[in-house]
Regions:
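Conserved donor-binding/catalytic core segment of Leloir-type glycosyltransferases
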Residues: 166-176
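Alpha-helix capping/helix-boundary segments
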Residues: 75, 132-134
Length: 176
C-alpha cells in the first residue's frame, strides 16, 4: 500500500516539474486553470466528494494551470513539487480540514502533521473548515504568516431540511 501511495506522489510531483519546464509563462491569467495536486474523487467522504464537485465547475488541468488547490488530507505532492510551484509563482490554495492526533491516527501522527505542515505554511491562501480547524492547525502545525479565512462546509438545503413540527392539537384524536 505504501509503495502505491509513494508512487502516486512521485507521479504527481513529476507532473509539477514537467509543467514548470514546458508551460512556464504560458498560463493564461484571465482564466482559472486549476491543478488539484493529485487529489482523488469519489462519492463517499468529504474530500472525495468536494473534489468531484469542484471538478464539475473547474476541470483538473495537469498542464498549463495557473493555480493549485491542495487539501490537508490529500498529501499527494512532495516537498520538491511544492517548492517548485512557489519558485514559479503559481498560487497554492490550501483547504485545511483537520490535523492528525495520537488518539485518532495512532503511530506516525506527528510525521503526517509534519508533511501537512509543509504545504500549509507555503500556501498562498488557506481555507479553514471551522474555527476549531484553525485552532488545531495553529496548535499542531504552527501559526501561519500567510492569508486565510474560515469557510464553513456547505449544506445541501434541498436534502437537509428542518423537520416539520407537529402540533399536538392537530394530530390528537380521542375515541370514545
Amino acid at each position: 500500500k505504501n509503495f502505491v501511495i509513494n508512487l502516486y506522489i512521485l507521479i504527481n510531483s513529476f507532473l509539477v516539474i514537467v509543467n514548470s519546464l514546458f508551460y512556464r509563462g504560458n498560463q493564461k491569467k484571465d482564466q482559472i486553470k486549476i491543478f488539484y495536486g493529485g487529489s482523488l474523487t469519489g462519492n463517499i467522504g468529504g474530500t472525495l466528494v468536494k473534489i468531484k464537485r469542484l471538478k464539475k465547475k473547474f476541470k483538473n488541468n495537469y498542464f498549463g494551470y495557473n493555480c493549485v488547490y491542495l487539501l490537508s488530507n490529500s498529501l499527494y505532492l512532495n516537498k520538491y513539487a511544492i517548492q517548485n510551484l512557489k519558485k514559479n509563482n503559481i498560487p497554492i490554495i490550501h483547504n485545511q480540514n483537520g490535523v492528525y492526533y495520537k488518539g485518532w491516527y495512532g503511530e506516525g501522527w506527528e510525521e503526517k502533521n509534519k508533511l501537512m505542515s509543509f504545504q500549509y505554511h507555503l500556501a498562498d491562501y488557506v481555507f479553514y473548515q471551522s474555527n476549531f480547524s484553525k485552532y488545531c492547525s495553529e496548535k499542531f502545525l504552527g501559526k501561519r504568516e500567510g492569508s486565510g479565512e474560515i469557510l464553513y462546509n456547505a449544506v445541501d438545503n434541498d436534502f437537509f431540511k428542518p423537520y416539520k413540527k407537529k402540533l399536538l392539537g392537530t394530530e390528537l384524536k380521542i375515541l370514545v
